[in-house]
Amino acid sequence: MKEGRGSFSVERGPRKERETAQSGMWKGNSPAGSQGAAMEGTGGELGGQGNWGPEDAPGLLARASLIMLPWPLPLASSALTLLFGALTSLFLWYCYRLGSQDMQALGAGSRAGGVRGGPVGCSEAGGPSPGGPGDPGEGPRTEGLVSRRLRAYARRYSWAGMGRVRRAAQGGPGPGRGPGVLGIQRPGLLFLPDLPSAPFVPRDAQRHDVELLESSFPAILRDFGAVSWDFSGTTPPPRGWSPPLAPGCYQLLLYQAGRCQPSNCRRCPGAYRALRGLRSFMSANTFGNAGFSVLLPGARLEGRCGPTNARVRCHLGLKIPPGCELVVGGEPQCWAEGHCLLVDDSFLHTVAHNGSPEDGPRVVFIVDLWHPNVAGAERQALDFVFAPDP
């Protein structure tokens, strides 16, 4: 028994020495102080257990798992994490700034006074346009605003099919710069290049809308009778009629600069119903207007140009007395009751009522339609750029 015990003690002694040496090796080779301390304590606990049984297996596995824990990430990984976070924050800040600039550009259209199509106006073309010959200081500012809003549209949608619109925004016809046709086509705000140009547009170019308006002639004429007055000028215009923009010229608009005028539309249900059925009406664009235009005998509106060549102005004759004349691009024409006349009002034009006072006023119903050669993608982009005020 003693020899057995002695032999046992001899065998156990070297074993403990080996365990102690292994524990010292763990301690000496540890690259991190905290990791080495953890390993030293674990090794000591393992070595101190002389008799291990099956019931000790869970505890041993738990202690052994401490040895296999991953070491801390190196300092370079932490630096990369910080750099990634900084770049992410910078990207989010850039996106915020980009969105803010887009919203400022979209909301500044009407405040800058540059992106407007103007009302129908007594000129049959919408009065002096911003950036046109009567306002030489607006051209560059308007051009820059249109370019910014077009870029905002492209970021939201696409540049596909925007070649002409992009060229128009970058090199719009400022004062005296619009090439036009023989110098008589000078749109004041937007010149869309490569559009077929003629002072008068064939009726077939807008056949559906022309036929719809002409078939609605009786209803539109009744609506005018319901809102008409004596146009004497001795009393203020009744509700819905605009003050005369020129002597002898009055108008009542159902749509003004792309915005519906609800009270006037309710008073003219037949005309409003016809407008709702049109396919090419510029109802969501500041270039789009619709309403009654009245010219009294003796009134004359000297030559001027409309704001853009992207639209065609449709005149439906309601009351056309003798002596009325429309000259567009040097070509004279006259209206006819119940028939439509399509005019490119970006050409220089003049309107006159040379009849006698007994003849009564000349009355036409005017609707702004898209030029038939403006593509659908271009219309969508221009509706975005020249969206009416909310």
Swiss-Prot record:
The keyword tRNA processing does not apply. It is a single-pass type II membrane protein. Residues 96-390 are lumenal. Its main location: membrane. Residues 1-72 are cytoplasmic. Its EC number is 1.14.11.-. It comes from the Eukaryota. Residues 41-51, 128-137 have a biased composition (Gly residues). It is an enzyme of class 1 (oxidoreductase). It is found in: Membrane. The modification Phosphoserine is found at S129. GO terms for molecular function: dioxygenase activity. GO terms for cellular component: membrane. Signal peptide: none annotated. Belongs to the aspartyl/asparaginyl beta-hydroxylase family. This is Aspartate beta-hydroxylase domain-containing protein 1. It comes from Homo sapiens. The gene is ASPHD1.
